[in-house]
């Protein structure tokens, strides 16, 4: 099939990548209907391997196969880090997950960073005086 004959069904791939895990969720364009949700902890056995790029790649391949089976063949990617008082950059699995989604046969549209950035001061979870040990 040529590219003009192939009908693209778009979805959104939400990649949340922290220093502890990587979670990939594929939804429809509205974001209301979840098509696939896979995390790094579902594809590895040891807890220490959850944030690794390898686990993120395997999770992205699995999510892409589920999305292709349900008819979504093109995605816009939204990458998110912890944000707030946490890291402002995504974890180690984000770029590996994007690469795996591109290699799995999905058409990639936009890639954007949706990490929540504070516009004022955020009080840390330990409070004003800090953690007293």
Curated annotation (Swiss-Prot):
Record has Ribonucleoprotein as a keyword: yes
One example GO MF annotation: structural constituent of ribosome
One Pfam family recorded for the sequence: Ribosomal_S11
PROSITE patterns per record: RIBOSOMAL_S11
One GO term describing the cellular component: cytosolic small ribosomal subunit
One of the protein's GO biological processes: translation
Record's keyword terms, sorted: Ribonucleoprotein, Ribosomal protein, RNA-binding, rRNA-binding
Function text: Located on the platform of the 30S subunit.
Subunit organization: Part of the 30S ribosomal subunit.
PANTHER family recorded: 40S RIBOSOMAL PROTEIN S14/30S RIBOSOMAL PROTEIN S11
Family: Belongs to the universal ribosomal protein uS11 family.
Protein name listed in UniProt: Small ribosomal subunit protein uS11
Species lineage: Archaea, Thermoproteota, Thermoprotei, Thermoproteales, Thermoproteaceae
